[in-house]
């Protein structure tokens, strides 16, 4: 292309807002500013030539000399028309680029001295490649941008001038004002084409992204419209078939419930998927009933609802003290939990296991803990549970399947953080249907129960906010399960504790339950003590409550039969008239010291008890017989005790060959009751020595402890229960292993005061204290 000659001109200047006019471009302009209209009139008076220059800022109403770009387009006015509103419509055609060398404002309009821009010499082969590429790229751009009519491409192919081609492309591109001005200022055609190609590439990328987004939105709209249409069709069909009335749509109600349940993302997706399935089913089908039941359970389970937990320690302590007498260790543990909770907002609920004999208040204590902490109370009885599905639920493939009892109870209580009482956790068993104790491992593990998996729900459920309290009569709980719980032992009550419990709780409760009015019945302390001593022998207070209930019933009967009677007083003297013959003897069962008879102390699931051990020696051939339903451990204790006696036969004055000439029979009465355990060794040994030497055993002495072959006394468990049993039985002197001396701190003071407790290390000390006559020939070292 030959360079154009630079020509200087003087010409009126029309400022344009947001518009850049290129050469060969025909465009209508609406002019409203007075100064601009005068500029058009001046151009019409001369040769109809005018220079169109863009303003730097479109918002400037009255631009100055410095507010215009220096490069514009010289244009020819093709047509000018004045409109009724005072504005002027003018049709112009761009002719050539020009640069302003001097711009002036004569007060009427802008005027400029300008010179046409020249095009530099270029490589025509390179330009041809650029033209082809630009046309191809613009074709791709037009396909994506539906706003540009396809006819533009046809007219573009008919343009032979590369400069005009570039300007036409620029005119149809949605460029910013600065970019349009940059194109106008480029006199080099090749540079202009390259710049436009880069701009087209950027626009094509944006249009492709826009197209993808538009397609996605369109698909979603089509899907939702299709689903709406099909649902309406289905409703119409069902209505025609009589399967659906004009009642509110059940599916919509379920959808609202799902939204209101505030489920976690996984659970909500599962529930919504099941709801979609339900919509496709006939409402009367069996499968629809199953799905509907599943969704009902999903919305009933508390996913987010919590009850407000109390943080007032003093109030909690008052509630626990009012509801329960004693049980200080348990109360302290609950108060410790509340104290930590008051400082830490998110704390995992403790998992406590209350172990103790029946009737000591384990279950009622769970209710009191719930009351003290402000949690809702829910109880699950585990006695006799042997199916794992009771805990984890049944899979939905089974007919009549339901969630496990755990989830059912959570749905019933309606909050995520109740106090959950697992009652009688030691009474579970396993069979071919699984082991529920193993299923509870996940429930009672604070690290795992954040994602408890119920077979029916099929989604994880968070149990970490639940405060679990388990109850048990014994430690006969699987070791892994026991390891996950904090065990708190509840021993039996002392006589004083039972008296206070009866006066504070049991008697008022039974008076109210039997509809006795105030002042109609008085039960003296001596009567309550009489019931405790002569009519009950238990670790708890259930039997005591039954006897008090019996007193109340008899009192009501008396009052109704004898209208003149207004008040009944029961004391120790007339207790026999209401409860009949005394069932137990308080004090020693036997007042005489007897040969071969020893009082041992035993621990049972219902508390401690006195255990009588009898031994008899008869002429024979050294046969050893033991009766009384003794377990293997107790039988081994007898064997060990016999060896200890044989090793000390000479010192004890026993014929060394007694085991060859005499038969020995060891018997523990109440043969129907199985007995076992490792704490009767010293009692067995003492009974054997007494029998073989003829030295009577003191009747006021009871003992507990295992024995080794060297005569050492080993420690035992359940000391508190055993000492309480000795106290109840009227025993005065108790022999315990020396290593159990530290356990005496847990024994009530009144029991310690009433008993003469001797910690012993060796069998020699036991024999010295237990036998009526001190054994001869034995060196005794008293334990300190």
UniProtKB/Swiss-Prot annotation:
GO MF annotation, one: ATP-dependent peptidase activity
Effect ascribed to mutating residue 676 to N: Loss of proteolytic activity
Pfam families with a match to the protein in the record: AAA (PF00004), Lon_C (PF05362), Lon_lid (PF22667), LON_substr_bdg (PF02190)
Domain Lon proteolytic: 592-773
Catalytic reaction list: Hydrolysis of proteins in presence of ATP
Enzyme Commission number(s): 3.4.21.53
Keyword Nucleus: no
Catalytic residues identified in the record: 679, 722
Main location group: cytoplasm
Source organism, top-level taxon: Bacteria
Signal peptide per UniProt: none
GO annotation terms (biological process): cellular response to heat; protein quality control for misfolded or incompletely synthesized proteins; proteolysis; response to heat; response to X-ray
Regulation: Contains an allosteric site (distinct from its active site), whose occupancy by an unfolded polypeptide leads to enzyme activation.
Subunit organization: Homohexamer. Organized in a ring with a central cavity. ATP binding and hydrolysis do not affect the oligomeric state of the enzyme.
Miscellaneous comment in the UniProt entry for this protein: Both its proteolytic and protein-activated ATPase activities are stimulated by DNA, especially single-stranded DNA.
Stated family: Belongs to the peptidase S16 family.
PANTHER family reported for this sequence: ATP DEPENDENT LON PROTEASE FAMILY MEMBER
Protein name: Lon protease
Organism encoding this protein: Escherichia coli (strain K12)
């Amino acid at each position: 292309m030959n360079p154009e000659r630079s020509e200087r001109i003087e010409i009126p200047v029309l400022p344009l807002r947001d518009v850049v006019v290129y050469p060969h471009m025909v465009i209508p302009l609406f002019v409203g500013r007075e100064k601009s209209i005068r500029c058009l009139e001046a151009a019409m008076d001369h040769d109809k030539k005018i220079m169109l220059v863009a303003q730097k800022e479109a918002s400037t109403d009255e631009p100055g000399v410095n507010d215009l770009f220096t490069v514009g387009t010289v244009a020819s006015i093709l047509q000018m028309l004045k409109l009724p509103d005072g504005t002027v419509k003018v049709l112009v055609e761009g002719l050539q680029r020009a640069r302003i060398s001097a711009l002036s404002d004569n007060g009427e309009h802008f005027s400029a001295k300008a010179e046409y821009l020249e095009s530099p010499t270029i490589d025509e082969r390179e330009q041809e490649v650029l033209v082809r590429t630009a046309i191809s790229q613009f074709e791709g751009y037009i396909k994506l941008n539906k706003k540009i009519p396809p006819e533009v491409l046809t007219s573009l192919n008919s343009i032979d001038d590369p400069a005009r081609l570039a300007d036409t492309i620029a005119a149809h591109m949605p460029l910013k004002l600065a970019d349009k001005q940059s194109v106008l200022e480029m006199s080099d055609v090749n540079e202009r084409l390259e710049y436009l190609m880069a701009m087209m590439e950027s626009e094509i990328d944006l249009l492709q992204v826009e197209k993808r987004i538009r397609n996605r939105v369109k698909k979603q709209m089509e899907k939702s419209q299709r689903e709406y249409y099909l649902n309406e069709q289905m409703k119409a069909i069902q209505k025609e078939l009589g399967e659906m009335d004009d009642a509110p749509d059940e599916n919509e109600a379920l959808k609202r419930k799902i939204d209101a349940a505030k489920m976690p993302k996984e659970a909500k997706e599962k529930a919504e998927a099941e709801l979609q399935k339900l919509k496709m089913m006939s409402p009367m089908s069996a499968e629809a009933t199953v799905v509907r039941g599943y969704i009902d359970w999903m919305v009933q389970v508390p996913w987010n609802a919590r009850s407000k937990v109390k943080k007032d320690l003093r109030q909690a302590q008052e509630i626990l003290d009012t509801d329960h007498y004693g049980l200080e260790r348990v109360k302290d543990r609950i108060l410790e939990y509340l104290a930590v909770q008051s400082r830490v907002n998110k704390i995992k609920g403790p998992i406590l296991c209350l172990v103790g004999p029946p009737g000591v208040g384990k279950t009622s204590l769970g209710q009191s803990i719930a009351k003290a902490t402000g949690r809702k109370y829910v109880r699950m009885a585990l006695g006799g549970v042997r199916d794992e599905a009771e805990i984890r639920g049944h899979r939905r493939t089974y007919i009549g399947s339901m969630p496990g009892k755990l989830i059912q109870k959570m749905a019933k209580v309606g909050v995520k953080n109740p106090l959950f009482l697992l009652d009688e956790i030691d009474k579970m068993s396993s069979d071919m249907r699984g082991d529920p104790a193993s299923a509870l491992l996940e429930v009672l593990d604070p690290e795992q129960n954040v994602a408890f998996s119920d077979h029916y729900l099929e989604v994880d459920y968070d149990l970490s906010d639940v405060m679990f309290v388990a109850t048990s009569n014994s430690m006969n709980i699987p070791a892994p399960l026991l390891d996950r719980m904090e065990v708190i032992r509840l021993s039996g009550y002392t006589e004083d504790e039972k008296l206070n419990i009866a006066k504070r709780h049991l008697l008022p409760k039974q008076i109210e339950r039997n509809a006795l009015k105030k002042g109609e019945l008085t039960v003296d302390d001596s009567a309550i003590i009489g019931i405790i001593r002569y009519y009950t022998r238990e670790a708890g207070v259930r039997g005591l409550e039954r006897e008090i209930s019996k007193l109340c019933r008899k009192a009501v009967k008396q009052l109704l039969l004898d209208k003149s009677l207004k008040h009944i007083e029961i004391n120790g003297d007339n207790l026999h008239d209401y409860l009949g013959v005394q069932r137990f003897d308080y004090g020693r069962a036997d007042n005489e010291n007897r040969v071969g008879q020893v009082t041992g102390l035993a621990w049972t699931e219902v508390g401690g008890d006195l255990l009588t051990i009898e031994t008899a020696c008869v002429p024979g051939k050294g046969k050893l017989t033991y009766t009384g339903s003794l377990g293997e451990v107790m039988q081994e204790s007898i064997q060990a005790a016999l060896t200890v006696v044989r090793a000390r036969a000479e010192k004890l004055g026993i014929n060394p060959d007694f085991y060859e000439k005499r038969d020995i029979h060891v018997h523990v009465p109440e043969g129907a009751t199985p007995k076992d355990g490792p704490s009767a060794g010293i009692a067995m040994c003492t009974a054997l020595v007494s029998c073989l030497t003829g030295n009577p055993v003191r009747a006021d002495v009871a003992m507990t402890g295992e024995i080794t072959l060297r005569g050492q006394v080993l420690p035992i468990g359940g000391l508190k229960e055993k000492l309480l049993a000795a106290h109840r039985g009227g025993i005065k002197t108790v022999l315990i292993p020396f290593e159990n001396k530290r356990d005496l701190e847990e024994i009530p003071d009144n029991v310690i005061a009433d008993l003469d407790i001797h910690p012993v290390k060796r069998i020699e000390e036991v024999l010295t204290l237990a036998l009526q006559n001190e054994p001869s020939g034995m060196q005794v070292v008293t334990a300190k």
